[in-house]
Structures are given as C-alpha cells and as structure tokens.
C-alpha cells in the first residue's frame, strides 16, 4: 500500500509564451500566498483508501492522527505501508502504532517519487482540478469533488 500527501493552491498557473531562441520566457505571476488545500491517502491495488483533505501542509501530528484514525482501522495485519522519507513520517510513536496494528512501514529511497505509485494519481487528480476550478464556488469544493469523482478521474 502506497501512502503520500499532496496539495494544490489556486495560484498554480503555468504561463506559456514565445521568445527568441536562447532567451528565457518571463511572465508576471503573483507572489501572494493563496489558500492551499492538501490531502493524504493510500493506494492499494488501484483503489484509494482513507483520503483526507485539509487546509495547509502536513506535519507529524496530522500524519499520526490520519494513520491511527483513518488508515490503520482499514488495514489487515501483515499489510505493508510504503512511504517516502518525509521527516514527519518518522518517529518512534508512528513506528509503534503501525507495529501494534500488525503492519510494517517500508521507506522509499530518498528522492524517488517515481517509485511511489500514488504520485501518478496525484498528477491526474491535479490536472482534473485545474481544468474545473471555474465550475465551483470555491477552491475547497473543487478538491473535494475530485475525490468524490475519483473512479471517473483515473483511467
């Protein structure tokens, strides 16, 4: 089972343009921070488990709460959780609660998002959201809708 967090904010625009060969394209982009919606979930055999959205970035307390309350109750003893090396994924408490559930934590090599299968889902999910921002009253509703429509979002 692959676990990861991701996030998006509503200023993620990618301007495109043309310029002379050898010249860098420049575009004006606001440096103002906007609302960031993040999420965490697990992927097992092509299905998302325990998706949770939140405002801001993930930290150890939030990750531990998600493990205890959302993910571990859905797992069976012997399940393996594959996760990246984010510093907030590592603590003695996290190791203990995973072991108590009869599961194992396997850490991916440093800087290897290509080995985490859920990263490919995040790419598709973010593109789905970018294409539909204007259809929603607010940004958070767009993110929540993406998870509700997950079976239709992913090939």
Model-derived regions, located:
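Catalytic-core regions built around general acid/base machinery
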Residues: 93-101
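RNase H-like two-metal-ion nuclease catalytic core shared by retroviral integrases
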Residues: 36, 83-85, 92, 107-128
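RNase H-like polynucleotidyl transferase catalytic core
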Residues: 25-31, 101-117
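Short, basic/hydrophobic alpha-helical segments
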Residues: 62-80
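Extended, low-complexity cationic-aromatic segments
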Residues: 1-68
